Every structure is written in C-alpha cells, then in structure tokens.
C-alpha cells in the first residue's frame, strides 16, 4: 500500500496551488488525508432536501454515495472485526459489526467528527433530521471509496474512528436485542 505520509506530503504541496484550500483543509482535519477529488466529499454533504439540479437532468445529492458507503462500511467493519476477534464465531462477529454500523453509532460518530455540522439540508422537521449524520457518514465512506479506494476507507475507520470514537471491546460486549428494534 502507498505510504500515506508520502502521499499526504505530495497532496499538501498540490494544495498550495488550489483556490479552495479551506474545503481541503476541513476534510483533511476530519479524515487524516487530503481528498484528491473534493467533489465526492462535497456531494456527501448534500442531503436530498438540498439537491442540486444537473444540466443534463436529474438531481445531485448524497443518496447514491450513501448507498455505496453503506456497502463499503459493512465490508470494512467486517474486515476489522474479523481481524480483531480471532477465533470468534460468525454470529458474534455479525452482531459486533451490526452494532458498529448501527444508525445510533454512526449518528454519534458523525457528531463527534464534526460531520453533522457540515451537512446541507432544508428540512426543519426534527423527525427527518435524526439520521442525517449517520446517512452523511455512510455517504462520506462512499466518497472516500470513489476518491481513494478500499484501503483508505479501512485506514480512516481504523485510525480515525475505531479507538477514538468506537471501543471495539466495549461495543462487542454491549447487549442489543435486534428483534425488539423491528
């Protein structure tokens, strides 16, 4: 895998010549690396209620990135759980992954990393706003994947999220009755 320190050095040099430095720096502080194509990350912040109409028709918002990010997040977290809980059974690992990628957990992480404050939306109904952060976090993972690939998604989750905001050992012991949530 590409040395992230060297890669960030190259990206920070490129940043010197950019007009939109502040956006890049904002995402760098959140992610731990510079985006290459900032458009993915900006799109991750666009809630459906704040959609942008495209010239060729259609709307631009974070829903497609959220879909992709959900799938990638399941794979990345599954990978991390598999590596950290050697010898554990499939049911244990599935439950642990489910707790990490739960809407409650993702909403909390989005709040902690400052993502929730950056989301662009127009809905003022609090019932609709309750999952904005978690949905945007999934979209952010989709943006990272399209911009940098699976390895950076895993790097971000391992180095910026797990440990700082999610305690693997603690969450694996947390009792959750998934059937009662249905």
Predicted feature locations:
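Double-stranded RNA-binding/processing signature
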Residues: 1-182
């Amino acid at each position: 895998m590409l040395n992230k320190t060297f890669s960030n050095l190259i990206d920070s040099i490129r940043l010197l010549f950019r007009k939109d430095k502040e956006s890049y720096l904002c995402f760098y502080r959140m992610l731990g690396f510079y985006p290459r194509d900032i458009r993915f990350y900006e799109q991750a912040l666009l809630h459906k209620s704040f959609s942008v109409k495209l010239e060729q028709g259609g709307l631009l918002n974070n829903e497609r990135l959220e879909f992709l990010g959900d799938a990638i997040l399941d794979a990345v977290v599954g990978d991390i759980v598999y590596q950290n809980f050697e010898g554990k059974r499939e049911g244990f690992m599935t439950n642990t992954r489910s707790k990490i990628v739960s809407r409650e957990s993702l909403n909390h992480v989005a709040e902690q990393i400052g993502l929730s404050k950056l989301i662009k939306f127009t809905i003022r109904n609090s019932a609709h706003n309750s999952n904005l952060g978690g949905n945007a976090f999934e979209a952010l993972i989709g943006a990272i994947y399209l911009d940098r690939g699976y390895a950076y998604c895993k790097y971000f989750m391992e180095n910026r999220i797990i440990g700082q905001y999610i305690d693997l050992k603690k969450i694996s012991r947390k009792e959750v009755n998934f059937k009662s949530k249905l």
